[in-house]
């Protein structure tokens, strides 16, 4: 429970939720602009490397500031090797397997459709958790999985014209959801620093390095033409770093410490709605009856699962930059 004396004002909660809804919902639109002229994995690697370094630098600077002023809080502890290993594995799963695959898929898939498919991650998370704990998934989880898969299946049906979606791109996005769910589960049980912000900074730093290494190894550097880079791509990348990885993430952490985790979890199904609306408004993405039906099935399944069952600490679905965080306590 959150102490009554620590309950924030309604405007503060609304502002933080609005930031998470709008910024994380708009990251899919930003990605669509980034991959127009920047290599997807290298761009993602730069994003998370810069964000991770910035977050760790902030934590170190804040720790020194507190020490100089004699503020009595637990100091920042340098991570152990086993914690860096966890950060590397989680970073690879979430940021290479998750975000990196989204970057690749959005070269052929509309940003709104990408967001809708990624919204199925909580469904996979629930199913994988049930398998690991050897507990039978609830009827709600099974129903949500079937309805969500039905929505994805509708997107894969053969079609033509505006109603056709690249099946390879759809498949890559499904792989991304599986990686996101796997990384979230591993982060929940693997050793990480007590400071959740430090753990996330480590994951971003490690994941960014993995993304850069893979991008170089598959020849993205050789295919990159600096002269072809557009202003829209650079602005999109800057938006992802500053707002997606830092501003919205800060609001997300604040919410986890001040409101119920079920309230924070609403972004899991609000974000795809925002992404679809922005894709239509700014990129002229077309909403056909088939894509609307698929989106309704997928988002409906996620709404039912997110709002209809107890949640473990930190389980709030896919975010662009974080695996799991505790919803209460002192997040350093």
What is the role of each PLM region?
Residues 23, 27-28, 56-118, 154, ...:
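Specific transmembrane alpha-helical segments of multi-pass solute transporters/efflux pumps
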Residues 42-53, 94, 99-136, 141-145, ...:
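Specific alpha-helical transmembrane segments that line the substrate/conduction pathway
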Residues 1-6, 48, 63, 157-158, ...:
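C-terminal-most transmembrane helix of multi-pass membrane proteins
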Residues 8-14, 37-41, 45, 79-84, ...:
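Juxtamembrane helix-entry segments on the extracytoplasmic side of multipass membrane proteins
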Residues 1-46, 58, 104, 162-189, ...:
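Glycine-/small-residue-enriched transmembrane alpha-helix faces in small-molecule transporters
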Residues 44-46, 113-120, 186-209, 241, ...:
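Helix-helix packing/entry segments at the starts of transmembrane helices
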Residues 34, 43, 47, 105, ...:
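Hydrophobic/aromatic residues within transmembrane alpha-helices
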């Amino acid at each position: 429970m959150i102490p009554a004396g620590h309950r924030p004002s309604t405007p503060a909660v609304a502002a933080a939720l609005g930031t998470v809804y709008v910024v994380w919902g708009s990251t899919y639109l930003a990605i669509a602009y980034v991959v127009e002229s920047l290599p997807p994995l290298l761009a993602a690697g730069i994003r998370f490397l810069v964000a991770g370094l910035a977050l760790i630098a902030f934590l170190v600077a804040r720790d020194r500031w507190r020490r100089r002023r004699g503020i009595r809080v637990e100091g920042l502890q340098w991570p152990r090797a086993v914690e860096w290993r966890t950060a590397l594995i989680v970073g690879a799963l979430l940021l290479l397997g998750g975000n990196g695959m989204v970057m690749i898929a959005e070269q052929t898939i509309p940003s709104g459709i990408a967001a809708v498919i990624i919204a199925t991650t909580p469904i996979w998370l629930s199913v994988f958790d049930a398998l690991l704990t050897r507990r039978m998934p609830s009827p709600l989880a099974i129903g949500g999985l079937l309805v969500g898969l039905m929505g994805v299946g509708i997107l894969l049906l053969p079609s033509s014209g505006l109603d056709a979606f690249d099946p390879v791109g759809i498949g890559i996005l499904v792989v991304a959801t599986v990686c996101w769910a796997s990384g979230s589960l591993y982060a929940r049980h693997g050793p990480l620093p007590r400071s959740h912000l430090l753990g996330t900074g480590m994951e971003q730093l490690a994941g960014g390095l993995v993304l850069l290494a893979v991008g170089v190894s598959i020849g993205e550097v050789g295919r990159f033409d600096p002269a072809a880079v557009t202003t829209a791509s650079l602005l999109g990348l800057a938006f992802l770093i500053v707002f997606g990885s830092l501003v919205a993430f800060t609001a997300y952490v604040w919410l986890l410490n001040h409101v119920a985790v079920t309230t924070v979890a609403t972004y899991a199904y609000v974000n795809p709605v925002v992404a679809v609306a922005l894709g239509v408004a700014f990129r002229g993405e077309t909403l056909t009856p088939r894509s609307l039906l698929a989106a309704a099935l997928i988002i409906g399944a996620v709404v039912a699962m997110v709002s209809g069952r107890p949640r473990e600490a930190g389980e709030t679905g896919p975010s662009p930059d974080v695996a799991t965080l505790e919803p209460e306590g002192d997040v350093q």
